[in-house]
Curated annotation (Swiss-Prot):
The enzyme's E.C. designation: 3.4.-.-
Name the UniProt record assigns to this protein: Metalloprotease TldD homolog
Signal peptide: none
Annotated organism of origin: Buchnera aphidicola subsp. Acyrthosiphon pisum (strain APS)
Described purpose of this protein according to its UniProt entry: Probable metalloprotease.
GO BP terms: proteolysis
Gene3D superfamilies hit by this protein: PmbA/TldD superfamily (3.30.2290.10)
Taxonomic lineage: Bacteria, Pseudomonadati, Pseudomonadota, Gammaproteobacteria, Enterobacterales
Coiled-coil stretches: none
Main enzyme class: hydrolase
A family per Pfam: PmbA_TldD_1st
Keyword terms of this UniProt record: Hydrolase, Metalloprotease, Protease
InterPro entries for the chain: Metalloprtase-TldD/E_C, Metalloprtase-TldD/E_cen_dom, Metalloprtase-TldD/E_N, Peptidase_U62_metallo, TldD, TldD/PmbA_N, TldD/PmbA_sf
Gene that encodes it: tldD
Amino acid sequence: MTFELVTESLLNANKINDQDVFIALEELCTRQLDYGDLYFQSHIHESWILENSIIKEGNYHSDAGIGVRAIRGESTGFAYSDQISLDSLRRSTKKAHSIILTKGSGKTKTLSKKTIEPIYKNVNPLEGFSSKEKTDLLYRANYIARSLDHRVIEVNASLTGSYEQILVASTDGNLVSDIRPSIQFSISVLVEDHGKRERGRSGGGSRTDYNFFLNQDDSSKEIRIDHWSKEAVRIALLNLSSKEALSGTFPVVLGSGWPGVLLHEAIGHGLEGDFNRKGTSIFTNMIGKKVASELCTIIDDGTIKNQRGSLSIDDEGTPGQKNILIENGILKKYMQDKLNARLMGVKSTGNGRRESYSCLPMPRMTNTYMLSGKSKLDDIIKSVDYGIYAVNFSGGQVDITSGKFVFSTSEAYLIKNGKIVTPIKNTTLIGSGLEVMQKISMVGDDLKMDEGMGICGKDGQNIPVGIGQPSMKLENLTIGGTV
């Protein structure tokens, strides 16, 4: 059903048929290619923004186009058009294949339509709710946040939804499609008390429609949008009473869920195939070697139902996969797209991703997480005489080559004598991804995925991702504070 809908929308409606697609691939093969593909995409997106208790913006954007790629060795010919038509397909094909100078007489394989089992429903979130119902979600969040505490002086909230259709045709005979819904809600709250101000943020998203926000969250047992609104206020008020963080080297307990962003940034990017093929990753040539504590098994899984980073197929037409990257501390594989996989003598892992038809695909993460261990969070906390409990992060930076990182917490606590004693702020975690992985001494049994807010940037391309981990203990991590 998905394939027929996408074919009708992207091809037939633009007076392109299967034979036209095959002829374009044949044209690519008049040069000596290792691989070539056509990428058709349509994308519609809306956003609603609330500030100062009023709707400040309502935006709608639509885009569609074709990307054509021809690959020989490490050379790539690429052209794209922001129109889907037979003429633009032909012109883009000629431009892409002209960059490959060596003539050839190769043949594309007969196109075979592959049915891929979708891991999210074919729903268009932009159509399910009226404009009033969408803005009412923002007004609801604003009301809840402001009614919780008189110290709330500012509430900013946003709602976004998108609906994407893609079709990939390649010289190896694949003809596959996908429909990708996506939604996200975010809220930021500013509180003030006696001239002192602090901010709290929360939100979430999924690959479904806006009803998701009005459904009950499994863990909090509250309506999701209500829960996130309360969370933003809670974090802001918590930071009002937080003490300045100490500097030094201490044990650190990481919370479950979003703190997995540290793994994503400090470890995940270093396991992407392009960095390792070029020798610029700290993990280059380390397949089969111990790179982490034996307690660590890290997975990238594009097949988790409705998760933000999930993909029925990647942007090269490879089905989404569950890849074990590190198993019991041993590096097992890198994440690969087709180009880097071929050059490294392995298969694509379903991680070829691109922001749009105007961008080249590259190895990217989907949903990256660490498996649960056997420890209870309470026992992990009790094992720390003096240290930090980092529940959530606000942001960070990492150097792929060295693996060094700096991350800032948005919610953290001081641990003394095995007990959480006081909230702290302005806390930064400083270290190296490779070193941190070796310092993991306890792993909790409470694996949790993030709420659906992940956006990953690489080489100017932003894509949705999922992040997760159980709670864990790191021995002797450098903490940057103000005291």
